C-alpha cells in the first residue's frame, strides 16, 4: 500500500466512512438516509452531521407511513455497496459519503414486463400532465404542470426547499446542513399505486361536505337580500335544483380609501356587511338555510382589516397595535392571522355563513409568505381550511390550486376562464389530468366567466359540469351574462334542465365515488389510462374520462350543425366490458372506437354493464334530501358476471367519518345463464341522521325479454316507465338492515 497515511486522513476528515449494515427503517448510512415508505415510494436525504428532518412539510404531511421491516430486505454486497429490495423494487446503493446521485445509486423496476433503471436525475420526458394554478385570463389550452403519472413509470418530488411545519406553523429549515430531500415514486405500470403513495406521504384527500358536490349559483353582481331570495325562488319555479348560493363581493362595503387594491379598486377586500343592500345579513342567511340552501362568502383578503371596517378598532386592540398605523396582511405572523380570523370571519360565520370562497389572486404582490419559502397560496389555503373546521365540521376549501399537498384542502376553484369552445375542451382535458397530482375536485366557472353569450356553448358546458366535482355556474359583472339556466332560450333551458335533473339523480353515486377517492386516492374524474394503462388507446383521447367506476363520459366541446345542433365526439369503449348509452340505452361492446353524434339535449355518456348504478329520485336539494328511495339502475352484462358496488353514506358534514362513523351498503349484480340477481345487502354501520328504512326502485333498461321477476322469493309484475323506456320494479319501504333480493328470469 503506497499511501496509508493519506487514506487514514480521509477517514479522519469524514470524506468517506464505512458503516455497518444498517437495519430498521429509515436506513441510515452516515450522512445519507433512505426511507422506505411503501414498496414503490422512498425518500432520499443527505444531511451533514446526520441532521435529518422528521418534521412534516406542506407536501410531506404524514411522516407515519413506513414500510415494515418484514416487507423489505437489505443485503451487503461488499465494498460499501448494498442491495435493498421490496416487492416492487431492487435498489443498489454504494455508500461513498456523497449525496445520492447517478453514480452511487440506482433502482430497478418493471415497466411493460421489462426491467428498467431509475436514477434520481429529474428529467421528465413522458409525464402525463397535471393541474394548473388558475385559468384566470386564459382563453384556450395552456401547458399543464406535471403530475405523478408518467409513461416512464416514475416521478420525483424535490422537497428540499420546503418550510417545515412545527407546532402547526411554518418553520424555516436548515438548508445549509440538509442538502437533499427527494421523494421517489417508482411504480412502473401501476398508476393507482402511485396515487396511493401520494396519500401515504402527503395525507389522503379528506371527505368533503356533501353539498360541495351539489348545484351552485354564483355571479359577480351586487344583489340585494330580496334578489338573493328571488334567485332561489327562480330555481324552484323553473324546476332546477340548487344546493349552494354564493355571495360575491357585493355582500361587503366598497368604501375603502387606502390599501394595495387590485384591478382598479381598493375595495376587493372587505368584511363589513353592506347594509344598504343587505340590511339584516343574519336574517337573510337564516332564510336561505330555511329553504335548504347553503351560503358561501367571497373573500379577497390581501389588504387585511383596514380603518374603514367596523371591526378595525377591536382588531387593532387585540393586536396591541396603534390604530393610526394600519397593519399589512401578514400570513407568516401567527398572532396576526389568528386575530384576523377572529374579527374578519367569526362574526359572519356565527350569523350562519357556511364557508368562504378564498379568491386569492395576489401572488404578484405576495408570492411567498414573508420570512418563509412557502407560497402565499399554499399557506393561506391551509389556514382557511383549518378555520372552517373550528365548529367540528369538515374543512371546506374553495380556492385556487397551490401545488403538491393542496389536495388536503378541497375543493379547488379554477379561476376566471374565457367562454369559448377551446376553453371548454381544455377544461375537459385538464380536469381528468389534474387528478394525477391529487387535484381531484375542480369547481369550474361553468359557461365561462367572461365572453359573449352563447347558449349552445353554455348547454355543452353544463353537460360537462354535470359530470364533474361541482355543477357551479359563475360569470363576471356583465348585464349580458347570467348563468341561471332558464334564461337562455326554451330549447336550451330544457336541455340544461335534463342535465341538472341527472346531476340530482346521480348524487348517491357521486358521493360514493367521492368516498372511493378518499379511500384510494383514485380520482373522481380520471383519464382512461389509470384503469386501462396497458392499452395504447387509453392515451389517445384526452376528451374522454371515467367518472367514478361505472360511468364513462366524452363531453362535446365543439359547435353543432343543423336544427338539432348535432355535434360529435370520439369515444373508445375499453375491452372487457359492455357499455350502454345513458340516454338511449344503446349497447356498445368493448374494444371498439366510435364517433358518436349527439343533438343538443344529449352527450356521449355510458354506463358499464353488469353493475348496479345507485341513484335517487329527482329532488330540488340533491345534497341534503334524505335517501328514502334508492334507485338501482342496472344494464345487463355481456355474459355471466358477479360484481359488487358499495354505496357510501354519512351525515355529509361532520368529521365523524374519520372515526369510522358511516354506513356502507353492498349492491351486488350477478348473472348466471338466463338468471340475473340484484341483491341489496344489509346496511353496515350507522351515522347521525341515518334513515332506518328505504324503498327501492330497480330500473332495467336494455333488459330485453324476461319471463318473470321475484322480489325476496315472491313473484311481482314490473311496471313500464314510458319516460325511461324500460321496466321498473318497485320495492316498498324496507328496513335497511334486511337484505333485498330481486331475481330476473330471462
Where are the regions that the model predicts?
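Conserved, charge-rich beta-strand/loop surface module that forms ligand/interface-binding patches
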Residues: 383, 417, 426, 711-746
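Catalytic-domain carbohydrate-binding cleft regions of carbohydrate-active enzymes
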Residues: 91, 104-602, 608
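N-terminal accessory segment at the very beginning of proteins
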Residues: 19-202, 208-211, 218, 225-227, ...
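Solvent-exposed beta-strand/loop surfaces of large extracellular or lumenal domains
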Residues: 56-71, 580-600, 708-731
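Sec-dependent N-terminal signal peptides
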Residues: 4-14
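Accessory carbohydrate-binding/adhesion or oligomerization-edge regions at the termini
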Residues: 585, 593-635
Amino acid at each position: 500500500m503506497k499511501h496509508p497515511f493519506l487514506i487514514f486522513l480521509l477517514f479522519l476528515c469524514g470524506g468517506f466512512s464505512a458503516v455497518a449494515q444498517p437495519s430498521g427503517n429509515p436506513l441510515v448510512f452516515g450522512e445519507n438516509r433512505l426511507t422506505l415508505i411503501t414498496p414503490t415510494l422512498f425518500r432520499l436525504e443527505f444531511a451533514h452531521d446526520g441532521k435529518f428532518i422528521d418534521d412534516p412539510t406542506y407536501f410531506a404531511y404524514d411522516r407515519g407511513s413506513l414500510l415494515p421491516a418484514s416487507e423489505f430486505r437489505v443485503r451487503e454486497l461488499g465494498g460499501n455497496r448494498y442491495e435493498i429490495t421490496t416487492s416492487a423494487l431492487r435498489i443498489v446503493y454504494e455508500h461513498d459519503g456523497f449525496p445520492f446521485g447517478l453514480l452511487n445509486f440506482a433502482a430497478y423496476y418493471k415497466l411493460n414486463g421489462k426491467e428498467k433503471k431509475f436514477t434520481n436525475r429529474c428529467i421528465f420526458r413522458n409525464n402525463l400532465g397535471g393541474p394548473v394554478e388558475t385559468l384566470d385570463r386564459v382563453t384556450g389550452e395552456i401547458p399543464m404542470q406535471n403530475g405523478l403519472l408518467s409513461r416512464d413509470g416514475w416521478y420525483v418530488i424535490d422537497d428540499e426547499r420546503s418550510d417545515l411545519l412545527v407546532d402547526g406553523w411554518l418553520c424555516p429549515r436548515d438548508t445549509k446542513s440538509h442538502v437533499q430531500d427527494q421523494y421517489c415514486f417508482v411504480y412502473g405500470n401501476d398508476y393507482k399505486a402511485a396515487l396511493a403513495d401520494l396519500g401515504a406521504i402527503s395525507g389522503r384527500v379528506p371527505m368533503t361536505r356533501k353539498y360541495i358536490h351539489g348545484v351552485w349559483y354564483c355571479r359577480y353582481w351586487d344583489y340585494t337580500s330580496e334578489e338573493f331570495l328571488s334567485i332561489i325562488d327562480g330555481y324552484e319555479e323553473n324546476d332546477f335544483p340548487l344546493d349552494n348560493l354564493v355571495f360575491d363581493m357585493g355582500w361587503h362595503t366598497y368604501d375603502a380609501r387606502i390599501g394595495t387594491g387590485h384591478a382598479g379598486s381598493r375595495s376587493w377586500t372587505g368584511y363589513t356587511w353592506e347594509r344598504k343592500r343587505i340590511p339584516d345579513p343574519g336574517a337573510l342567511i337564516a332564510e336561505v338555510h330555511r329553504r335548504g340552501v347553503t351560503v358561501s362568502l367571497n373573500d379577497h383578503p390581501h389588504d387585511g382589516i383596514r380603518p374603514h371596517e367596523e371591526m378595525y378598532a377591536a382588531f387593532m386592540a387585540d393586536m396591541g397595535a396603534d390604530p393610526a398605523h394600519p397593519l399589512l396582511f401578514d400570513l407568516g405572523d401567527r398572532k396576526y392571522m389568528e386575530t384576523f380570523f377572529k374579527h374578519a370571519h367569526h362574526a359572519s360565520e356565527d350569523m350562519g355563513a357556511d364557508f368562504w370562497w378564498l379568491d386569492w389572486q395576489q401572488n404578484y404582490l405576495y408570492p411567498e409568505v414573508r420570512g418563509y419559502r412557502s407560497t402565499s397560496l399554499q399557506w393561506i389555503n391551509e389556514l382557511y381550511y383549518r378555520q372552517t373546521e373550528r365548529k367540528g365540521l369538515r374543512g371546506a376549501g374553495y380556492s385556487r390550486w397551490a401545488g403538491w399537498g393542496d389536495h388536503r384542502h378541497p375543493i379547488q376553484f379554477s379561476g376566471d376562464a374565457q367562454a369559448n369552445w377551446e376553453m371548454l375542451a381544455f377544461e375537459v382535458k385538464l380536469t381528468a389530468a389534474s387528478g394525477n397530482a391529487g387535484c381531484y375536485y375542480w369547481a369550474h366557472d361553468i359557461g365561462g366567466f367572461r365572453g359573449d353569450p352563447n347558449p349552445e356553448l353554455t348547454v355543452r358546458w353544463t353537460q360537462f359540469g354535470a359530470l364533474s366535482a361541482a355543477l357551479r355556474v359563475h360569470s363576471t359583472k356583465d348585464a349580458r351574462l347570467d348563468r341561471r339556466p332558464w334564461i337562455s332560450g326554451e330549447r336550451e333551458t330544457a336541455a340544461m334542465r335534463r342535465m341538472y335533473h341527472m346531476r340530482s339523480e346521480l348524487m348517491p353515486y357521486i358521493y360514493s365515488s367521492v368516498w372511493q377517492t378518499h379511500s384510494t386516492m383514485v380520482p373522481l374524474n380520471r383519464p382512461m389510462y389509470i384503469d386501462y394503462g396497458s392499452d395504447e388507446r387509453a392515451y389517445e383521447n384526452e376528451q374522454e374520462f371515467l367518472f367514478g367506476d361505472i360511468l364513462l363520459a366524452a363531453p362535446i366541446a365543439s359547435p353543432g350543425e343543423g336544427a338539432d345542433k348535432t355535434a360529435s365526439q370520439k369515444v373508445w369503449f375499453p375491452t372487457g366490458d359492455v357499455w350502454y348509452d345513458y340516454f338511449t340505452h344503446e349497447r356498445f361492446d368493448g374494444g371498439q372506437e366510435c364517433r358518436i353524434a349527439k343533438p343538443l339535449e344529449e352527450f356521449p355518456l355510458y354506463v358499464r354493464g353488469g353493475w348496479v348504478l345507485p341513484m335517487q329520485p329527482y329532488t330540488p336539494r340533491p345534497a341534503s334530501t334524505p335517501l328514502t328511495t334508492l334507485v338501482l339502475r342496472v344494464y345487463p352484462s355481456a355474459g355471466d358476471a358477479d360484481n359488487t358496488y358499495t354505496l357510501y353514506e354519512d351525515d355529509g358534514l361532520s368529521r365523524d367519518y374519520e372515526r369510522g362513523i358511516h354506513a356502507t351498503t353492498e349492491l351486488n349484480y350477478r348473472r348466471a345463464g338466463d338468471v340475473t340477481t340484484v341483491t341489496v345487502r344489509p346496511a353496515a354501520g350507522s351515522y347521525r341522521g341515518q334513515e332506518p328504512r328505504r324503498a327501492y326502485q330497480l330500473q332495467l333498461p336494455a333488459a330485453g325479454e324476461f319471463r318473470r321477476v321475484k322480489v325476496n322469493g315472491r313473484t311481482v309484475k314490473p311496471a313500464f316507465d314510458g319516460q325511461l323506456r324500460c321496466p321498473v320494479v318497485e320495492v316498498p319501504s324496507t328496513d335497511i338492515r334486511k337484505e333485498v333480493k330481486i331475481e330476473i328470469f330471462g
